[in-house]
Amino acid sequence: DDQTIWQRRTSIERYVSQLGIADVMPTTHLAFYTDTTYGMRYWTYISEELPKICREFFPQMSDKKEDNLAAGLSMGGYGAWKLGLGASETFGAAASLSGCLDIIEDVGRHLEGDSRDAALFRGIYGSLEQLEGSDNDLMALAKKLKTSGKPIPRLYSWCGTEDFLYEGNKRAWEYMKEHGIQEIIVHAPYIINLGNAV
């Protein structure tokens, strides 16, 4: 599936239609919202170009960060937090639904070897050394933002206790708490999918 699943399999259009909310659903394919080592500039597109284009096409869209939220499921949850932490001047909040929040543990282990996943993730991030501590590492990005003294967006995280990403979410939650970054955490005894997310 791709970003269109939200329109096809949820009621999101019905929810936002009466609220005056612009619901923008871009794709970065399998590139994890990253300017990849193979040259695709998905991060630049999603964090800089897309907001500008949307506001040019729809001038009534607010450019106030408090009016802009990034949200996503799974890889999109990682992308949402990355937008919140890495483009905090644009996004005032970020919501991750069963997101890949500990990229070092959840993806980093796939960077070694000759598997299809290893080739995919090396094409995105390069080596584990290049990934760890970079702006693609959400925990390093949070620390960088906190150190800068800039306002930190509201962070929301929802992950089922049976989800394979749950342990990574717990590590991210603990890290944020240790570093004084507030977030809203919801976890429940199931796996999150579109049927119970929206």
Indicate where each model-derived feature is located.
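Non-catalytic cap/lid and distal C-terminal segments of serine-dependent acyl enzymes
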Residues: D1-V198
